[in-house]
Design a protein with these regions (language model features):
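Non-transmembrane, amphipathic alpha-helical segments
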Residues: 17-24, 28, 160
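Glycine-rich, aromatic-bearing surface loops/beta-hairpins
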Residues: 132-224
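Residues that form generic nucleotide/phosphate-binding pockets
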Residues: 10, 14, 35, 39, ...
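Residue-level signal for secondary-structure boundary elements
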Residues: 19, 41-44, 48-51, 179-187
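Hydrophobic-cavity lipid-handling domains and compact docking modules
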Residues: 57-143, 147-148, 152-153
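Short N-terminal edge-element motif at the start of the domain
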Residues: 24-67
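N-terminal, Lys/Arg- and Ser/Thr-rich interaction peptides
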Residues: 1-18
Length: 224
């Protein structure tokens, strides 16, 4: 049977750890917001005398969201307010680093989404964005990134990699290059051949036929 001591011990151990992880993740997100703002200014200063029609815009949307718009794409960075552990079959739990201290597996999460800028501009509620990566941060500032292509292997040394300003800048760069190379494909004809009157009227008002970069897209880790 459980007693109050077991409850107190769990509160001291897990709850305290989660509070530390939340604080660490919030600090990282605040640094990420500053890095995104700096990135927008840096690229804009280079482009201003070379390309006139490439729009760049940084926007902070409250405590947990930040956007970086460049040309036709927008990266949305969202910090989740909860702290997570990993499912039993996740490879992180098999690492020596986590086995030495199982509380190291508790992580805060910053999700990275790619949306078409016009989807947000025109409030096209049917449009879809894509989760391209997730940054996991633990109580010791160790981190790894889970995502697609480069995002899945460039930042995966959880045991030895601590988050810092330089690595945040690199993550932003990789996300931007990945997004710019992830082009918009025209949908299959049969997927869009039927259009209701409702959709037609909505389209005439605000272009609300669903648009997304790909159909059937998955992160690389989902195919493992």
């Amino acid at each position: 049977m459980y007693n109050e001591d077991s409850i107190v011990n769990l509160l001291k151990e897990k709850s305290a750890t989660k509070q530390i992880v939340y604080s660490k993740t919030k600090d990282v997100f605040n640094k990420l917001v500053l890095a995104l703002n700096k990135k927008e200014k840096s690229i804009a200063s280079v482009l201003k005398d070379q390309v006139k029609n490439v729009e760049l815009e940084f926007k902070s949307n409250g405590e947990f969201d930040a956007q970086l718009k460049f040309a036709g794409d927008t990266l949305l960075f969202h910090m989740h307010s909860n702290i997570f552990d990993f499912p039993p079959n996740h490879h992180i739990l098999n690492s020596k680093y986590v086995k030495e201290d199982n509380l190291r597996s508790f992580c805060g999460v910053i999700n990275i989404y790619n949306f078409l800028s016009d989807s947000l501009k025109y409030n096209r509620l049917n449009d879809e964005g894509f989760l391209i990566g997730r940054i996991f941060i633990n109580k010791e500032d160790n981190f790894f990134v889970e995502g697609d292509k480069e995002l899945d292997f460039l930042f995966n040394d959880f045991a030895n990699q601590k988050i810092n300003d330089e690595l945040l800048d690199q993550i932003i760069n990789v996300c931007m290059v990945y997004t710019l190379n992830f082009d918009l494909y025209t949908p299959n004809f049969n997927d869009v051949r039927l259009v209701s009157v409702h959709h037609l009227l909505a389209m005439s008002m605000n272009q609300k036929i669903k648009t997304s970069k790909r159909l059937g897209y998955k992160l690389s880790h989902e195919n493992k």
